[in-house]
């Protein structure tokens, strides 16, 4: 089905003749074509071109002059019984001039004078002021004068340009005066400024985190220019502006155009973290900076004390060892000689000497019960006692490897620094040495341990199972002779050490 063609010249001539007759008789029609109930005056003239083409004649209503130029075809009468009139052609674009451009109303039409839609806001203004009649229609049914009224020259001259009206929106203006009043004011400014190209080109830049600003502008007198520093201080004090994250940690790439506060530079940390007007914040920040500076100085002094310390066994500078794990000191509890942690532990684990010799200092032979690993060299007695206490507290939070696997007994007893507790699911605490004979207790110690839900030995590898069984038989034989053979203190210490090495291997 083909699209209906544009109105013919004969039809336009008929419409023009009918409009001329209506104008001579003093009859005025509305802006838009409206169907008349009867077409007596226009029927004879309008039927001629249709009769020539074989169409049925139908009445035609008078058409205004500005619509006749656009080529709009009037609608047929409802009671004529003829074919419906073809749709108007949109190729010419004249019909769009009857519709006000929605972008021009908001001051954002980028077409300017080349826009297909109307930029005449006089009819819209009168309709808004009247509040009852739409643009182009009058209350008495007569001709509408809104479409022919032009804004006064004085208002056009005094209206500000559209670009300046949208430079910095304010939220509260539309809420106080009403939305329609703000819309009318901005429509007047847009009409006075002509095309709204400048308004959308000079719009403010969107910044993440910036509060929402309304679309309309409140007419307010321009404030006198102030310096950027004074204005920023007033904003910071009045609105509680937050510090800029980037400026407080280095450099802000936005510079002076940043919407957040750039504080003063602190002499201690060198960052822009001091509030320009808040004295309490400045004092608190300075106190925190001084405390951090004191801690850094103490750390620097501690590192400086151990820079030239040489291990008394390997004769190497502790901080210059190849392995980073060996760059620690082994602090003896009763001696001030310096050793690296690796060398002093190897010395104290030697078995070819007596226990009192092993636990003594390699240089001064003073016995020390503890060896505390430390990254810094500690020499004063007060600092050493503090270090020992911190070491014991740290060890008390770790589970003892011998207590759980020994089913409630540790070879070191009360002198052990580690935590003695049973894992979850082990049930009640097993009986100690006082519950039976000493040989029976050690026999129970080397038996397989119930762990979790099933029975398993320390490891499930066949070789380790054989070693464990042989060790169990050896301990049973050795403990059976315990009451017959006298044991010295050093021999019992050696036994404890062998037990420790044994469990280290098996676990």
From Swiss-Prot:
Protein name, entry field: E3 ubiquitin-protein ligase makorin-3
Effect of residue 340 to G: In CPPB2; uncertain significance; functionally impaired in vitro
Pfam families in UniProt: MKRN1_C, zf-C3HC4, zf-CCCH_2, zf-CCCH_4
GO molecular function: identical protein binding; RNA binding; ubiquitin protein ligase activity; zinc ion binding
EC number, as in UniProt: 2.3.2.27
Zn finger limits (C3H1-type): 95-122, 238-265, 394-423
InterPro entries per record: MKRN-like, MKRN1_C, Znf-CCCH_4, Znf_C3HC4_RING-type, Znf_CCCH, Znf_CCCH_sf, Znf_RING, Znf_RING/FYVE/PHD
Segments of this protein annotated with the region Disordered: 1-48, 69-89, 126-149
Function: E3 ubiquitin ligase catalyzing the covalent attachment of ubiquitin moieties onto substrate proteins. Acts as a key developmental timer that helps ensure puberty begins at the appropriate age, by inhibiting premature activation of the reproductive hormone cascade. Epigenetically regulates GNRH1 transcription by disrupting the binding of methyl-DNA binding protein 3/MBD3 to the promoter of GNRH1.
Cellular compartment(s): Nucleus
Cytoplasm keyword on record: no
Record field: compositional bias (Low complexity): 1-21
PROSITE patterns on file: ZF_C3H1, ZF_RING_1, ZF_RING_2
Source species: Homo sapiens
Effect on the protein of changing residue 239 to T: In a colorectal cancer sample; somatic mutation
Main localization (coarse): nucleus
RING-type zinc finger span: 311-365
Note from the entry: Imprinted, expressed from the paternal chromosome only. A deficiency of MKRN3 is not sufficient to cause Prader-Willi syndrome (PWS).
Keywords annotated in UniProt: Disease variant, Metal-binding, Nucleus, Repeat, Transferase, Ubl conjugation pathway, Zinc, Zinc-finger
Tissue: Ubiquitous.
Clinical condition linked: Precocious puberty, central 2: A condition defined as the development of secondary sexual characteristics in boys and girls at a chronological age that is 2.5 standard deviations below the mean age at onset of puberty in the population. Central precocious puberty results from premature activation of the hypothalamic-pituitary-gonadal axis.
């Amino acid at each position: 089905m083909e699209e209906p063609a544009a109105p013919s010249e004969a039809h336009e001539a008929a419409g023009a003749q009918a409009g001329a007759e209506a104008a001579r008789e003093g009859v005025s029609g509305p802006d838009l074509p409206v169907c008349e109930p009867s077409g007596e005056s226009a029927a004879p003239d309008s039927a001629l071109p249709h009769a020539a083409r074989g169409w049925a004649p139908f009445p035609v209503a008078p058409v205004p002059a500005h619509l006749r130029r656009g080529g709009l075809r009037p609608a047929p009468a409802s009671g004529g019984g003829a074919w419906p009139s073809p749709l108007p052609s949109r190729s010419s674009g004249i019909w769009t001039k009857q519709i006000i451009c929605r972008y021009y109303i908001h001051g954002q039409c980028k077409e300017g004078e080349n826009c297909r839609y109307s930029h005449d806001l006089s009819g819209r203004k009168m309709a808004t002021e009247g509040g009852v009649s739409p643009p182009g229609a009058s209350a008495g049914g007569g001709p509408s004068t809104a479409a022919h009224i032009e804004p006064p020259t004085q208002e056009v001259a005094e209206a500000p340009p559209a670009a300046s009206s949208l430079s910095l929106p304010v939220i509260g203006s539309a809420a106080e005066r009403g939305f329609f009043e703000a819309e009318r004011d901005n429509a007047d400014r847009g009409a006075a400024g002509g095309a709204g190209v400048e308004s959308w080109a000079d719009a403010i830049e969107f910044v993440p985190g910036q509060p929402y600003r309304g679309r309309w502008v409140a007419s307010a007198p321009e404030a006198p220019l102030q310096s950027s520093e004074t204005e920023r201080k007033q904003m910071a004090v009045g609105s509680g502006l937050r510090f800029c994250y980037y400026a407080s940690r280095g450099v802000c790439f936005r510079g002076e155009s940043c919407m957040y506060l750039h504080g003063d530079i602190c002499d201690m940390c060198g960052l822009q973290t001091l509030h320009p007007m808040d004295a309490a914040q400045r004092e608190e920040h300075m106190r925190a900076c001084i405390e951090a500076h004191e801690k850094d100085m103490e750390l620097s002094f501690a590192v400086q004390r151990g820079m030239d310390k040489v291990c008394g066994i390997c004769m190497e500078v502790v901080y210059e060892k190849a392995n980073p794990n060996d760059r620690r000191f082994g602090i003896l509890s009763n001696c001030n000689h310096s050793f690296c942690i690796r060398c002093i532990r190897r010395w104290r684990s030697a078995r070819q000497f007596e226990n009192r010799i092993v636990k003594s200092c390699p240089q001064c032979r003073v016995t020390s019960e503890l060896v505390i690993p430390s990254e810094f060299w500690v020499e004063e007695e007060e600092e050493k006692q503090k270090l020992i206490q911190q070491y014991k507290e740290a060890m008390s939070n770790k589970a003892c490897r011998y207590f759980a696997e020994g089913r409630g007994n540790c070879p070191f007893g009360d002198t052990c620094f580690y935590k003695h507790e049973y894992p979850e699911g082990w049930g009640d605490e097993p009986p100690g040495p006082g519950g039976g004979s000493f040989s029976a207790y050690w026999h129970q110690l080397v038996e397989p341990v119930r762990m979790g839900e099933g029975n398993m030995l320390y490891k499930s590898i066949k070789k380790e199972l054989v070693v464990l069984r042989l060790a169990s038989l050896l301990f049973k034989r050795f403990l059976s002779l315990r009451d017959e053979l006298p044991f010295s203190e050093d021999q019992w210490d050696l036994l404890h050490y062998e037990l420790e090495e044994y469990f280290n291997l098996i676990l």
